[in-house]
From Swiss-Prot:
UniProt name for this protein: Small ribosomal subunit protein uS12
Keyword annotations: Ribonucleoprotein, Ribosomal protein, RNA-binding, rRNA-binding
Gene3D superfamilies in UniProt: Nucleic acid-binding proteins (2.40.50.140)
Function statement: With S4 and S5 plays an important role in translational accuracy. Located at the interface of the 30S and 50S subunits.
GO CC annotation: small ribosomal subunit
Record's subunit section: Part of the 30S ribosomal subunit.
GO biological process, one term: translation
Similarity comment: family membership: Belongs to the universal ribosomal protein uS12 family.
Keyword hit for DNA damage: no
One of the record's GO molecular function terms: structural constituent of ribosome
Superkingdom, natural source: Archaea
Length: 147
């Protein structure tokens, strides 16, 4: 803080510290961190995974320049009732997921917890359907349990 408004005396340390503390609140990243806003907005509430019930299947169009319909599901989380969209990874993975199934979701792995690749606004992916891993279902190593 070498500006003209900064105190420059021998005992100016405390004043400089208070000034720096006050200035930090003008930076949005500091505000988010100090007030833990990311955790408050997170549907999983800081947990790595979450269980939910499939509300509906949806197909989302990929962003330009790609052209595809990405198969996703709307999931209502059991812990807090919030609805999120989760991607169904793998060939024909959507066929193993039915409405009212219980699924486990986790973050999709995008930059700073955001969406990944060309799927707009989707931050989560389906990991398990019932007690079965979605990856194993797609590969044909497991069969979905019939009720």
């Amino acid at each position: 803080m070498a500006g003209s408004k900064s105190p420059k005396g021998e005992f100016a340390g405390r004043k400089l510290l208070l000034k720096r503390k006050a200035s930090r609140w003008h930076h949005y990243k500091y505000v988010n961190k100090a007030l833990s806003l990311k955790l408050k907005a997170d549907p999983l509430e800081g947990a790595p995974m979450g269980r939910g019930i499939v509300v509906e299947k949806v197909g989302l169009e990929a962003k330009q320049p790609n052209s595809a319909i990405r198969k996703c599901v709307r999931v209502q989380l059991i812990k807090n009732g919030r609805q999120v969209t989760a991607f169904a990874p793998g060939n024909h993975a959507i066929n193993f997921i039915d409405e009212h199934d219980e699924v486990v979701i986790e973050g999709i792995g995008g930059p700073s917890g955001q969406a990944k690749g060309d799927i707009p606004g989707v931050r989560y992916k389906v990991v398990m359907v019932g007690k079965n891993s979605i990856r194993e279902l797609v590969r044909g190593r497991q069969e979905k349990v019939k009720r």
